Regions:
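Signature of lipid phosphatidyltransferase scaffolds
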Residues: 3-5, 10-38, 160-203
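Acidic/glycine-enriched edge-of-secondary-structure segments
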Residues: 37-54, 69-82
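A short, well-structured juxtamembrane/interface segment
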Residues: 55-59
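Primarily the HKD phosphodiesterase
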Residues: 63-128
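Long, hydrophobic, amphipathic alpha-helical segments used as structural scaffolds
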Residues: 75, 103, 108, 136, ...
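Mid-sequence acidic-hydrophobic segments that form the walls
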Residues: 124-131, 156, 187-190
C-alpha cells in the first residue's frame, strides 16, 4: 500500500527486473530500451535468451536466413562452432547469390586466432569477393569482447562475451539491431585503413 492506502502496482519491480536483465547482456536501460519495450507488439518480437552454443548456432542461422540485403558479423575469429558449419555456409551462399546487391561484412579481432587450418567461411569469402568482405578491427577496437550477427537492421544474435554462449536473439527487433549496427558501422569505417587480406591457412 502507498501513503494513500492504495495498492501499489508492479511497474517499478517490472522495470527493475527488465533493467537487470538487459544489463546482464550489456544493454543499457535508456531511450533504446524504452523503444524496445514500446515496440513489443506482434510487429516486433521480444528478445530470446540463449544459454548454449547450440542455441547460438541455431539463432545465427535463423538471423542470417532472414537477411535481404546486408549481414554484419562481429567476431574474434569466425568462431568455427558457429560460422564454419555447413548449414550456415549454405545460408550465406544462398543469401549472396539470391539477392541483388547483397553484402556480407565481417569484422575480426585478428587472424592469428584462426585455428585448425583453413576456415571454410574464409575460403568462401575468397570465392565470392564481390559479396563478402572481411576486415581486421582497428587497434582501438581489438579489445571489444562482444560477438554478434545482424541481418539488415532488424534481426540480431548478440553475446556480451564471444567466449561464452549466454546471449540474446531478436528475430524481428529493429531497435536492438540498429543499436549494434550503428556500433558495427563505426568500427567498420575505422578499420578501413587497417584492412588487409585474410589468407586461408594452408598445410
Amino acid at each position: 500500500l502507498n501513503n494513500a492506502g492504495e495498492p501499489v502496482t508492479g511497474t517499478r519491480e517490472s522495470r527493475t527486473t527488465t533493467s537487470a536483465r538487459l544489463s546482464s547482456f550489456g544493454l543499457e536501460d535508456g531511450p533504446m530500451t524504452t523503444a524496445v519495450l514500446a515496440e513489443r507488439r506482434p510487429a516486433t518480437e521480444t528478445l530470446h535468451v540463449l544459454t548454449s552454443f547450440d542455441e547460438v548456432r541455431a539463432a545465427t542461422e535463423t538471423v542470417a536466413a532472414s537477411g535481404q540485403r546486408l549481414i554484419s558479423i562481429m567476431t574474434p575469429d569466425l568462431e568455427p562452432e558457429i560460422y564454419d558449419q555447413a548449414a550456415l555456409l549454405e545460408i550465406i551462399k544462398r543469401f549472396v547469390l539470391g539477392h541483388s546487391f547483397a553484402k556480407v561484412r565481417v569484422l575480426m579481432r585478428d587472424q592469428a586466432r584462426l585455428s585448425g587450418g583453413a576456415n571454410r567461411f574464409i575460403a568462401m569469402a575468397h570465392r565470392l569477393t564481390s559479396y563478402l568482405e572481411i576486415r581486421i578491427r582497428a587497434p582501438q577496437y581489438r579489445e571489444l569482447t562482444a560477438a554478434y550477427c545482424i541481418a539488415d537492421d532488424r534481426a540480431i544474435v548478440y553475446r556480451l562475451r564471444a567466449d561464452r554462449a549466454e546471449g540474446i536473439a531478436g528475430f524481428n527487433n529493429p531497435p536492438i539491431a540498429r543499436q549494434y549496427l550503428q556500433e558495427f558501422d563505426a568500427v567498420w569505417q575505422a578499420s578501413a585503413i587497417e584492412e588487409r587480406e585474410v589468407r586461408v591457412a594452408r598445410s
